[in-house]
Amino acid sequence: GFHAMFSHQGRMVFVDPLRNGEGYAVYYQQDAHSRLEEEADRVIGSKASKLARQVLVDGNERKRYVIAISAAGEYTQYHGGTVEAGLGAITTLLNRVNEVYQRDVAAEFQLASGNDTIIFTDTATDPFNNDDGDIDANVTVQQNAQTQAGTKLGPFDIGHVVNTGGGGLAGLGVLCTAEKSAGMTGSPNPVGDAFFIDYVAHEIGHQFGADHTFNGTTGSCGGGNREASQAWEPGSGSSIMAYAGICGEEDLQANSLPYFHSKSIEQMRAHMARVASCGTSQSLTNNAPQVAAGNDYVIPANTPFVLKGAGADLDQDPLSYTWEQIDLGTESFSVASMVDDGSRPLFRFVAPTSAPERTLPSLPSLLTNTLAKGEAWPATNRELNFRLTARDGKGGVSSDDMKIQVVNTGKAFALTSPLVTPLAAGQTQTIDWDVAGTNAAPINCSKVDLYMTRDEGVNWTLLAGGQPNSGSASVTIPAGSDGTARLKVACSDNLFFAISPLKLSVTQRVEGGGGGGGALCFWTLALALLGWQRRRA
């Protein structure tokens, strides 16, 4: 049947035929089937060595690898029971995996010639058991399909097998090696991104040399599945090589985001370089994006901050950006332990955006005064390392790193007044904040800028810039319609800021006039004051 996928307003939309053949399902990625029933994958082989940071993907070359994908009889039966139906399902799967690998690591897969000879239709006579033992059987099946008389499976660089009951299992860094067929994925519902991304792209990532990126140890994140040298993501993590949805209370979300962490890209590109003679190189008319993460800073503990970078592309391609924390530390073992202990990662991986900025903790968390899972206040004297990564969508991926030194001054830089008092448009308002030692070394913030938002942080109006970081300043509240607002005090030459914890009411100043206007003004103000007092009571 017809299969399609496209991007709509930054979200992936899929079109797949219903199994009864009586129509089509159109759905967003996050509405796909849930992840594989709390099944963890396993990694076979030695752990990859820790790598130094490097330019990720140049963008002017793409590697094409030939892949052989075997299908157990149960997988083929799920998709209609014929070789043609099984081959069509594998083609749909590969199209989705290709989209991710082309964009993130400049690699793509071409199905091996004669792949139909390793798609089995009979569950009783096929060479597989529909479990994780199929990974060993697959090595033999694919070797025999190339060597036995009467078979016609062509040469390939990487092999995999799909079934409906085996979970995930793969050899680490086996692409273009003698163990190249050591990869398998199984699910009772082998369709959609829960299968294509969470499992198949994940297991092939292992075959490319990428290890797990989660730092949690509950649920399936336990049992030795955490890899300390690559545990960049809090809790279950959310990138492809993490374990979103199968780590119990440490789950950040139900399914993986369809993106690799930059550290996974490093590992995969390193293995691709080690087997550089394998695969076919394709020249691209493309330049890698340019990206700058900005300067290093010193900030106070328990205080929000915003990371700001910049990017450009010689080809004028629209860029997408991710800010990732790249710190390794102590594993977490519960939600309560996902806090700052001086070493562990504090901030989760999030999907790329069109702007090279990220507010930490996230703005929704600040507005609700409730941290999202996968966010924690930097509370100790420590160093935070961050990476800005830019993607051009064509395989060009560039990154730049910066660091933040966190200093616990004993207090948070925080707005202290007004907290509930309404604001009067057109009138002078005094804003107070706790300096928290930020005007002294080593932070040395001497000036602050004061802002107001009427739309919960979508837009900010500058009220006064370059004011002394003394803890108090007077500003004029802009004229405008009645409503609500929040205030912000931000260090002029640093990243940290303080924001109103609650919405503040804004009312219009009533101007006096001739005749009875003065009396009207008096009674209007009196009634307004009475209303304020009732609201505060």
Label the predicted regions.
Residues C521-R536:
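A cross-kingdom C-terminal cell-surface attachment/processing module
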Residues G23-L175:
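Fold-level signature of zinc-dependent metallopeptidase catalytic domains
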Residues A112-D136, V174-P258, E324, G329-F333:
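The catalytic-center signature of Zn2+-dependent metalloproteases
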Residues T303-G311, Q429-D432:
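A short beta-strand segment in extracellular, disulfide-stabilized domains
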Residues D313-S320, L328-F333, N381, G395-G396, ...:
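Extracellular acidic loop/turn motifs
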